[in-house]
């Protein structure tokens, strides 16, 4: 049973729409139908009463009062509007004249009815109605069909009572006219039977139209569901913003969420790539130190501080990149002041160990007064990548110089290597792009360096060195030690 319920519940929007609208249409159809039928019934009763009153007036015209007796002479070719049975009473309720002798009908006439004009109904069984119909064969045949279907069926006859005041030629009379054809056998009564068929046909016609209306109305939601499935299957990046007014806000917020999640994912992936790249230098120093220990070129006491320093740097780098990954775009940069010379000394010392076999000669021309304002790890990451590239591609010499203004810090790194072709001087800053594909590397370092300098409103400019190789000018902006007043 639970499985069966799960197939139908919760109901889809289309089924809900169809059930709700079908219920509304059904209720309205029933309400309108009942109002129409009640109105028709009232109109039918009024029409019947007018017809029977016309018959009553006809008999009153034909009636004559002679010798204290009532005489009614009916012409042979009289044209009556409908088959009727007429009874005439005096003011005391005594029967003066009857069109035919029908005892059961005379008993059904209530004395109270004879006191005023009115419209009434009497109930009779099929056999009594048959006596009242006399020679109407078509109606008798219909009545026989009713008798065959239900022998206990009851028929309803309309009765019109009209009171005529006394005149010089006629005493006060009450004429009762009974419609001999029961209401159930009149063609106008069939409207009650037709109502069920009309209501059924109405629903059969309306439900397909409601289905079309539901399909058309819910198309934007179906389109949105399809786009969400495409997102799940990675066939789409964003939802289509061109949708209905009611869904615009939802789609816009979902697209913002998707963009935010994609940017966060890209940021984590980029940060992880940058972290692995930043660990290359300290790991290379550790590897070089271990190699020196193995070949006994360095004692344990000499190697220990070097290894501890690189392990500390690895720990700092991991913490630094975890912090970067959790930073939001509007996070303020650190305003710490760091002397540049000691930072570059540590970097060159580590790189000398990495490129010990190559015999790189790194020279520094840095004034002790020059300082960097910002996050120390940002400076180390930028200059570490730039210096690593210089040491990797130089023949022997790498020169570092620096100068500072109120707003900017300029650090120039030059080498005597093959240099960078003019057409490649912008490409090298794109992630994954490398000029020399023969040497190991991922093409990440300079891209990371430029991204960090942009956070300081700075840049890195590649050019040609006086030594014959590459010249990299690193520019850090926002170097005022205290924020300026706005």
UniProtKB/Swiss-Prot annotation:
Catalysed reactions listed for this entry: ATP + protein L-histidine = ADP + protein N-phospho-L-histidine
Annotated keywords: ATP-binding, Cell inner membrane, Cell membrane, Hydrolase, Kinase, Magnesium, Membrane, Metal-binding, Nucleotide-binding, Phosphoprotein, Protein phosphatase, Transferase, Transmembrane, Transmembrane helix, Two-component regulatory system
GO cellular component labels: plasma membrane
Sequence ranges assigned to domain HAMP in this UniProt record: 215-266
Residues that, per the record, bind Mg(2+): 385, 442
EC number per UniProt: 2.7.13.3, 3.1.3.-
Positions contributing to ATP binding: 385-393, 415-420, 434-446
Subcellular location: Cell inner membrane
Binding residue positions for a divalent metal cation: 151-152
One example GO MF annotation: ATP binding
Segments on the Cytoplasmic face: 1-16, 216-486
Periplasmic membrane side: 38-194
SUPFAM superfamilies xrefs: ATPase domain of HSP90 chaperone/DNA topoisomerase II/histidine kinase, Homodimeric domain of signal transducing histidine kinase
Annotated InterPro entries: HAMP_dom (IPR003660), HATPase_C_sf (IPR036890), His_kinase_dom (IPR005467), HisK_dim/P_sf (IPR036097), PhoQ_Sensor (IPR015014), PhoQ_Sensor_sf (IPR038429), Sig_transdc_His_kin-like_C (IPR004358), TCS_sensor_his_kinase (IPR050428)
Recorded topology in the membrane: Multi-pass membrane protein
Domain Histidine kinase, chain residue ranges per copy: 274-480
Modified residues (Phosphohistidine): 277
Complex formation: Homodimer.
Function statement: Member of the two-component regulatory system PhoP/PhoQ involved in virulence, adaptation to low Mg(2+) environments and the control of acid resistance genes. In low periplasmic Mg(2+), PhoQ functions as a membrane-associated protein kinase that undergoes autophosphorylation and subsequently transfers the phosphate to PhoP, resulting in the expression of PhoP-activated genes (PAG) and repression of PhoP-repressed genes (PRG).
NCBIfam families per the UniProt record, alphabetical: PRK10815.1
Protein name from the UniProt record: Sensor protein PhoQ
Organism: Escherichia coli O157:H7
Lineage: Bacteria, Pseudomonadati, Pseudomonadota, Gammaproteobacteria, Enterobacterales
